[in-house]
Amino acid sequence: MALLQISEPGMAPAPHQRRLAVGIDLGTTNSLVAAVRNSIPEALPDDAGRVLLPSVVRYLDKGGRRIGHAAKEEAAIDPRNTIVSVKRFMGRGKAEVEGAANAPYEFVDAPGMVQIRTVDGVKSPVEVSAEILATLRQRAEDTLGDDLVGAVITVPAYFDDAQRQATKDAARLAGLNVLRLLNEPTAAAIAYGLDNGAEGLYAVYDLGGGTFDLSILKLTKGVFEVLAAGGDSALGGDDFDHLLFEHVLAQAGLEAAALAPEDVRLLLDRVRGAKEALSAAPQARVDVKLSTGEKLAQTITRDTFAALVEPLVQRTLGPTRKALRDAQVSAADIKGVVLVGGATRMPVIRDAVAKYFGQPPLVNLDPDQVVALGAAIQADLLAGNRSGGDDWLLLDVIPLSLGVETMGGLVEKIIPRNSTIPVARAQEFTTFKDGQTAMAIHVVQGERELVSDCRSLARFELRGIPPMTAGAARIRVTYQVDADGLLSVFAREQHSGVEASVVVKPSYGLGDDDIARMLEDSFKTAEVDMRARALREAQVEAQRLVEATEAALVADGDLLDASERATVDALVASLRALAPGDDADAIDTATKALAEGTDEFAARRMDKSIKRALAGRKLDEI
C-alpha cells in the first residue's frame, strides 16, 4: 500500500501557486495591462515591445477588424468605421453623444446606450471596448504563459452606475472575470504610495483622454483612505485637441462641417501630434494636405496653445476646490500631488497644478502607466497572492449622494457623497394614506433637495403591504453600494416580511457635465433648496392632517356638538386653502391651529375606542 505524502506547511506546490491576475487601464486614448511579477508591478508589452495599446478599433466587412496600432494608422482613411475614444460613449444615450466634437460616426437611434453603424453592422460602445479588453487579455496570457483568474479594471472616479456596469459588461464579453472596478486616482495612489512608502495627505490629479478626476487621499501605515473625490466625466485631453483643431481651422478660414470625414480625422491626428510636441518644444508645426488638394501649414507656439486652453485648465480647478472643501483640508495641507494620465504631460497643466498647490507635482512614475500598475497590485492581492509586505487597506468613496423620493417630491439622502465603500445604509419609511397596500420606491442621485433637480436612477414597487392606517406600516429601505461602486436597493415591510429589490442598472448614465453641475448647483442653490424643502414638508403635513381630520369626522363626527363641528370645519377649510400656496410659515401656523383645535376631539375618539375595547369584559380579563 502506497503511503500518502503530506508536505510541510507552506511547501505544497499547488495550493501556493501564484494565481495570475492583471490590472487593466481601459483608457480613452490608450489602454494597457500590467501584472505583478517577482513582487514588482510592471506593464506588459506587445510583441513589438510597446506597452500602450491605442484604444482604437477599425471594423472591416465580412467580420474583419483591426485593433490598436494598426487601426490607429488607418483611422484617417476610414474614419466612419474606425472607432476612437469609445470610453466617452460608455453608458451614454444617443442624445448625449450626438454633439460629440467632430465625431464622424453615424449614431443609431436605439433604446438605451448609443450604437454606432459600421460596415460590419451596428456596434455598441460595450462591444468596441470588449475588443480592446480581449486584446489586452490575450497579451497578458501570452506573456504570463497561462490563463488569467481575473482582472482589476480601472474607471474614472466620476463614472456613474451605468458607465461602471457597461465596463463590467465589456469585460465579460472579452472573457475577463472582473475582480474589482477600481477608481483610477485610487489605483495611482496605490502605485505611488507602495512604491515610495508615502504617508500623509495626497491629491491625485488625473487628466486622461476623456475624463478628469481629482481625489484627496490620506495614506497612513498602509491604509489608503479616499477622503473626497471630484471631477468631470466629460473633460479630457481630447477636448484640448479639439480646441486646437478649431483654432487651426479658424486661422485657415475653414469650418469643420465643410471637411470630409477623412480630412477631419487626419487634421485631428496632426493637431494631436503638435500638442504632444509642445510638451518638449516651444513651438510645433501643423502640416496637412487635404483631400481637396488644399494645404494647411501653421506654426503653433506654446504660449498660443496655453492661452487657447486656459478655460479647460480652469475647469479642472473647480472640482479640485470642491474636493478639498469636502475633505475639509486646504491646498497647503497637501503633502504631494500625483499626476496621472498622458494629458498631464502638458506644461500648461503642470504649471497650473504647481501654482494652485504651491509645489511642483510628483512625476517620478510614468503618468501613462501608474494607474495600471496600481490596478495590478490590487489584482494580485485579490487573487490571493498575499505576501508579508501586502498588509494594506483600501478605503474608496462614492462621488454623489444616493437618496429616495418621499412625499412632495423631496429627496431623503440615504448614503451621502464621499461615503466609504462598500457601504450599506437603511432608513425606515411609512405609508401616507389609510389602507395603502403598495409603495413606489424612486432611487435618485445628486445633492439637491428636490427630486426634479436630481438624477433618476431606478424605480420599483413594494406590493402586498397589509392594509393599515396611515403611518402604521414600517418599510425599511436599504441602500447597498458594493466595492465596484454599483448600487442595489432593498425594501422590506417589517410586519409582513414582504420584500422587493432592484439592482440599479439605468439604460444609460449621466450626461456630459451632469455630475459636476449637480454639485455646483447644490452649493449655489442650497438656501433656495432648503426653503423649497420646508415648503414641501409643510404642504405634505398639511395634506396629511386635513385627510386624517376629514376621515375622523366621517367616522366619529357625532362626538362634536354643532359649535365644535363648525370650528373644526373652519380650521380644515382654512388649512386646505393655504396648503397649495407658497407661504410655508402660514401653512405651518394653520397646521398647528388645526392640530390644537382637534386635540379634544382626538381625546374623545380615544375614550370611545377604549370603551368599545372594554365593553362586556370583566376586570380580571383585562
Curated annotation (Swiss-Prot):
GO BP annotations listed: iron-sulfur cluster assembly
Gene Ontology MF term list: ATP binding; ATP hydrolysis activity; ATP-dependent protein folding chaperone; unfolded protein binding
Keywords recorded for this protein, A-Z: ATP-binding, Chaperone, Nucleotide-binding
The keyword Transcription regulation is assigned to this record: no
InterPro entries: ATPase_NBD, Heat_shock_70_CS, HSP70_C_sf, HSP70_peptide-bd_sf, Hsp_70_fam, ISC_FeS_clus_asmbl_HscA
Purpose of the protein: Chaperone involved in the maturation of iron-sulfur cluster-containing proteins. Has a low intrinsic ATPase activity which is markedly stimulated by HscB.
PANTHER family the UniProt entry points to: HEAT SHOCK PROTEIN 70KDA (PTHR19375)
Recorded family membership: Belongs to the heat shock protein 70 family.
Protein's name according to its UniProt entry: Chaperone protein HscA homolog
Taxonomic placement: Bacteria, Pseudomonadati, Pseudomonadota, Betaproteobacteria, Burkholderiales
Gene field: hscA
